[in-house]
Design a protein with these regions (language model features):
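Short alpha-helical hairpin
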Residues: 20-21, 37-48, 71
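Mid-length scaffold segments of soluble, non-membrane domains
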Residues: 69, 76, 82-144
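Short N-terminal segments immediately surrounding and downstream of signal-peptide cleavage
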Residues: 21-35
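A structured, mid-to-C-terminal "fold-capping" secondary-structure block
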Residues: 20-23, 124, 129-228
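Membrane interface segments of multi-pass transport proteins and intramembrane proteases
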Residues: 42-59, 161
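Sec-dependent signal peptide recognition
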Residues: 2-10
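N-terminal signal peptide c-region/cleavage motif recognized by signal peptidases
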Residues: 14-17
Length: 228
């Protein structure tokens, strides 16, 4: 299977990205960060605020639930790769329920009946496999990441393309934009907190790395820092 082969090749690549300095590329990262900040302040954030204030909450919920159902597909694959069998069965149940009773994912019926949502991506999968995070990096447009997570993001994006390949170009673009806006709306409260920081770059980096620790260890990160 070409996707599995691609994933393992990326895993091999990811193992060479280890570095003791968490922000080895800080100088260049700050340049990209400033670019991303300007792009966000002048484009993404205004769109997100307009969307939140203008679109009925019911409609926003449909977009959010539909995106969440698609995300469950990626989560299921990563849970299997991480040997989280109980979680994978639960996530499969979520997909089944929401894709049928929930009208192709427009309604999150699964959560209402007690099927808890989990989130797993390929970056987390590589962490579970023992791949070091490598240094912190800031990706153009995509934002905070690490060498491991940027590799994981590539896999996640290509898998997203595979899942939506039956859509035409217009439908794919519309779906991508809807998911991007939905994600940005959810980050609006965080934006306010970060902007009040003495150094927004450092605050963003710290917030991202802490959240990734939280995600990788399923909400129970170790007290002492380690290679993750």
């Amino acid at each position: 299977m070409k996707n599995l082969l691609r994933s393992f090749l990326l895993l091999i690549f990811g193992t060479i990205t280890m570095a003791e300095d968490v922000d080895l590329f800080e100088a260049s990262n700050r340049v990209v960060f400033e670019f991303n900040q300007a792009l966000d302040e002048n484009f993404f954030e205004p769109i997100a605020r307009t969307y939140k204030e203008s679109i009925p909450k019911t409609m926003q919920n449909r977009v959010s639930d539909f995106s969440s159902n698609l995300n469950d597909i990626y989560t299921l694959g990563n849970e299997i790769l991480q040997f989280k069998l109980f979680d994978s069965v639960s996530t499969f149940g979520r997909i089944l329920v929401n894709s049928t009773i929930g009208l192709v994912g427009l309604f999150d019926v699964a959560s209402d009946i007690g099927l808890e949502k989990t989130n797993e991506d390929f970056g987390q999968t590589m962490a579970v496999w023992g791949v070091s995070s490598g240094p912190y990096v800031v990706l153009p447009v995509l934002g905070p990441s690490t060498m491991r997570d940027s590799t994981g993001t590539y896999v996640d994006i290509t898998e997203n393309i595979d899942v939506t390949k039956e859509l035409n170009t217009t439908e794919e673009v519309a779906l991508l934009l809807a998911q991007a806006v939905d994600t940005r709306v959810k980050l609006l409260p965080v934006t306010v907190l970060l902007k009040n920081s003495d150094d927004v770059y450092i605050a963003t980096r710290s917030s991202y790395l802490q959240k990734r620790q939280f995600d990788i260890f399923d909400g129970n990160p170790p007290i002492e820092n380690d290679d993750f």
